[in-house]
């Protein structure tokens, strides 16, 4: 019962937020899965590669500080990462934990596809510092 109420209330909030939305193609750059939740709740297409992943605050800040180089750098697979999901490594050793993917090739394909839609002139950045893999 409580779960059903939560779903109904969340959808009511989502409808209200969608009705106020004027920017239909924001590039949300988040250090965890929050951006994906926001895109889903607002019914928007993903305009960012930062979906279904987690980055430590240190790695996220390094990526932001070196944005133009990082976003165009090659992402290589980290073999034997110790995690049960793929991990990639970009510029300056920045690690990307693709926590909702099974295979690195799939996560890399989505990363590249969404990088093509990224709009640096229409970007919002959010760092979450709630601990390891919060909200993922």
Write out the residue ranges for each language-model feature.
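Extracellular glycan-modifying ectodomains
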Residues: 2-136
